[in-house]
Amino acid sequence: MTIIITGTSTGIGFTLAEYFGKKGHKVFGLSRKNVESQYFTTIPTDITDNTQVQAAISEILKTENRIDVLINNAGMGMVGAVEDSTKEDILKLFNLNLVGAVQMMSAVMPNMREQKFGKIINVSSIGSEMGLPFRGFYSASKSALDKVVEAMRYEVYQWNVEVCSLHLGDIKTKIAENRV
C-alpha cells in the first residue's frame, strides 16, 4: 500500500511511518523538517500551505500512481486559559489542526475517488469530546476536525473511501514541548 503520514518529524507520526515502512508499505512522510529514515521517504511540506500540499501529492502520484491511506497526524497543542489566548495563537492552532488536515483530505480525494478505494485516518484527541481546562482551544480544534470527518464520512462512502478520527489520550511526545 501507498501510505501518506503527516507530522513525521517526531513522535506518533515518525513511529507510524517507520512501522509501516518496516512492514513493506511505501510510506511518504510529510513534515516541515526533512527527516532521514531507511523506512520512509520524507517530502518537506507545510500542510498549512495548500500549494505545498498539492505539490507533495503530485510528486507521490508521479511515482506511485495511487494513494491508499492518509494518516493526518500533524498537529500542535495550546495551553492557557481561554481568556488569555491570543487571536494569533488561536488562528495558528486551527490553521494546522483543522485547515491543514482538511487540505490534505481534499488533496487525496480525487485519486481515492478515481480508484474507488481509500482510508483517511485523522489523529484527534479525547480532548475533542469535552472542553479540557486550560486546553479549550485545542479541544475546540480537534472537535471541529471530528465534525468535518463525520460529515465527510457520509460524503465519500459511495466511492469506498473510509474516513475516521482516532481519539488518543495524552501520549509523551514532543507536542507537549511545542504547545503555544
What are these regions (language model features)?
Residues 105, 141-144:
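Active-site helix of classical SDR
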Residues 105-106, 150:
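A short, exposed helix-loop element centered on a Lys and neighboring polar residues
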Residues 81-82, 89-91:
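Substrate-binding pocket helix/loop in short-chain dehydrogenase/reductase
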Residues 158-180:
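SDR active-site lid
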Residues 9-13, 17:
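N-terminal Rossmann NAD(P)H-binding glycine-rich loop of SDR-like oxidoreductase domains
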Residues 125:
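Residue(s) in the substrate-gating loop at a strand-loop-helix junction
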Residues 45-55, 87:
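The beta1-alpha1 cofactor-binding region of Rossmann-like NAD(H)/NADP(H)-dependent oxidoreductases
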